[in-house]
Structures are given as C-alpha cells and as structure tokens.
UniProtKB/Swiss-Prot annotation:
Coiled coil: none annotated. One of its GO terms (molecular function) is uroporphyrinogen decarboxylase activity. Its main location: cytoplasm. This is Uroporphyrinogen decarboxylase. HAMAP family: URO_D (MF_00218). It is found in: Cytoplasm. It catalyses: uroporphyrinogen III + 4 H(+) = coproporphyrinogen III + 4 CO2. InterPro entries: UROD/MetE-like_sf, Uroporphyrinogen_deCO2ase_HemE, Uroporphyrinogen_deCOase. It comes from Ralstonia pickettii (strain 12J).
C-alpha cells in the first residue's frame, strides 16, 4: 500500500477541485541553476550518466524540494530517452545540445523504425519507483510525482534533424514533401509515448506531462494534423493509476496559445501555457474544461524581488479574474534558465503561496 500524500494540492488543482492556495512546480526545477545539481552531475560524469542512474536521478529530483516548498516533484530524465531506445545513438557533447548518430531521413530509415521495447527504458521506471520511495517522510509522501515525455512531433523534430534546430528545415521539408513518411514516424512515436507514460504510471507516476516544445514552430492547420492529433492519441491511451482514476494528463505546447480550444478538446486534464497567453482569456476560451498551468516569463526571475512579486501577483490576478483561483497550477511559461539566482526562486515560491492564499481569503469575504 502506498503512503498517503501529505500535500495533494497539485493533484486537486489538476482536477479543478478547491484548494487553499495555488500550487506550483517549475519546468526544469531540478537543473543547472542549483549548485547541488551541478555537484551531483559532476559525480555522475555526464548528463546521460546522471539521467540513466536511478540513484542519481532520485537525488537530483529531490534537491529542489529540499530547498523550496514546491507542490510536486518531476522525474529527472530527458525527453530523448525514447528515440535513444529506438537505437538512434543519442549523445550530448560538452557545451552542445543533443545529437543523434543515426537521424531518420530516408524511406528506409522510416521503414526500420519501430516502437522500442520498454525494457530498454527500465532505468527510467526504476527511477520513478525509487523517487516515490524517497518522497516518503514519516509515513506520508511529501508531494505527488510527475512523469513526462516529449510529444510525438517534438521527438520527430530531433529524430529527423539529428539534434536541435533553428528552423526545422529538414523535418518540415519531410512533412510537406512526404507527409506519409512523417505520419508513419508520428504513429510510431505516439505508440511509444503511450507505452512509456503508462510504464511510468505503473512505476508510480501520479500525473504526466507531454512536452510539445516545438509544436509552436508549425503553421496553423499543420499543427492540428501533425502535432495535436497525435497528442490526442496519447491522452486517449493513458491508463488509470493505482486508485482506478485515469492519471491526470497535462499538455504543453510552447507557442501554442493560438490552439487552446482545440487542445482542450483532447480530453487532457490541464494545459500548460507560455507567457504570451493571458490566463483570464485562456479560461474563457477553454470554458472551464481544463485546469491551466503557467505562465510566468522565466526571465522575470532575473529581476529584483519586488519585481518578481509584482509579476507573480499579476499572473495570479489574471487567472482569478476569470472566475476564482481554483484549477490553476503556477509554473513558468517554459523551463527555468540555468543562470537563475536560486534565491529568486525562494521569492517566487513564497509569493505564489502567500498571495494566492490572500486572494482566496478576499474572494470568500466578498462572497
């Protein structure tokens, strides 16, 4: 029997249930802005050494929770574990982004592609189970654990480009010239992501997020066909957790503000939004069908404490103006910068919690 949750605020917000305050976690909360993360990474020898060791992955997942009163933990891993398991030869050169030795570019490459055997990703599922155990303190689990994956389209971008890209020329050329090949890659990726997230859930993930980092690079109409349709498949394929309820699913398309209505129709429980989106309008557009997660500009954290507090309040007030504070998970609009001063995050966390409590008290007194 798993330990009861000491703090289930995040899961309640995902299900649009009342909460005493607005919960928060941060994309890339276990990362290079923390000196303790850098020390662990140095011991691991490399990024992949860190990500592929359940013990190290557990250590770095817990580091931000020991420093800040965050309301969720997120598995420390990388979105490219899935294409790596497909045999594409992932590497990370020092100071450079990811590289695949065998990019998927020809008809033969696509024909050779298949959904990986999840046993090759056992190190991820072992990490999930180990993190769940490590989160238990005095017989109770401190906060819920989020699992995640890249979206089928975002994974395809790296697989076809062979790494990161400024303009996605290679992958978009394939999409327009050979949509049949692109759909084949996306079908395989969607099934792989479903299997991967369900295995994380079986190991103990209590919510999952699909990171569609590059969906916003697509034209309107193309996004719906080549990214959103496959994320909808993923949402449909997610199964129930230990309590019999389907584990909540968060979809996050960076630059996806244009498509919130369509994203809400996938059946996802929550949508992540970046800082270009007004949360009050986002609530109106999604008509209360989903929780919303976001959406502070990460660079606000380079400002003085008073400016950070003012921007936190603006985000919370924008959301509350749409009809109360419930159903909101505070986050950044994208991953936290490695150059962020750790003390700025303390200011952020304290302000989110204290001001969101104050907003609820004020709403009750006016109610």
């Amino acid at each position: 029997m798993s330990a009861p949750l000491a703090n289930d605020t995040f899961l309640r917000a995902l299900r649009r249930q009342p909460t005493d305050y607005t919960p928060l976690w941060l994309m890339r909360q276990a990362g290079r802005y923390l000196p303790e993360y850098n020390a662990t990474r140095a011991r691991a020898g490399s990024f992949l050494g860190l990500a592929k060791s359940p013990a190290y992955a557990t250590e770095v997942t817990l580091q931000p929770l020991d420093r800040y009163a965050l309301d969720a933990a997120i598995l420390f891993s990388d979105i490219l574990t899935v294409p790596d398991a497909m045999g594409l030869g992932l590497s990370f050169a020092q100071g450079e982004g990811p590289r695949f030795a065998k990019p998927v570019r020809t008809e033969a490459d696509v024909a050779a592609l298949s959904v990986p055997d999840m046993s090759s990703l056992q190190y991820v599922f072992d990490a999930v189970a180990e993190i769940r155990r490590a989160l238990v303190q005095d017989g109770r689990q401190r906060v819920p654990l989020i699992g995640f994956s890249g979206s089928p389209w975002t994974l395809a971008c790296y697989m076809v480009e062979g790494g990161g890209s400024d303009d996605f020329r290679t992958v978009k050329s394939m999409l327009y010239a050979r949509p049949d090949l692109m759909h084949r890659i996306l079908e395989i990726n969607a099934q792989a992501v479903i299997d991967y997230l369900n295995a994380q859930i079986d190991a103990g993930a209590q919510a999952v997020q699909v990171f569609d980092t590059w969906g916003g690079a697509l034209a309107d109409g193309i996004y719906q066909q080549f990214s959103l349709a496959y994320m909808a498949r993923v949402v449909e394929g997610i199964r129930a957790g230990a309590d019999g309820q389907r584990v909540p699913v968060i979809l996050f398309t960076k630059g996806g503000g244009l498509w919130l209505e369509a994203m809400a129709e996938t059946g996802a429980d929550a949508l992540g939004v970046d800082w270009t989106v007004n949360l009050q309008l986002a609530r109106q557009r999604t008509a209360g069908r989903v929780a919303l997660q976001g959406n502070l500009d990460p660079t606000v954290l380079f400002a003085e404490p008073d400016a950070i507090r003012a921007q936190v309040r603006r985000v919370l007030e924008d959301y509350a103006a749409g009809g109360g504070s419930d159903g909101h998970i505070f986050n950044l609009g994208h991953g936290i910068s490695q150059f962020t001063p750790p003390e700025a995050v303390s200011v952020l966390v304290d302000e989110v919690h204290s001001f969101s409590r104050a907003l609820r008290t004020k709403a009750r007194s006016h109610g």
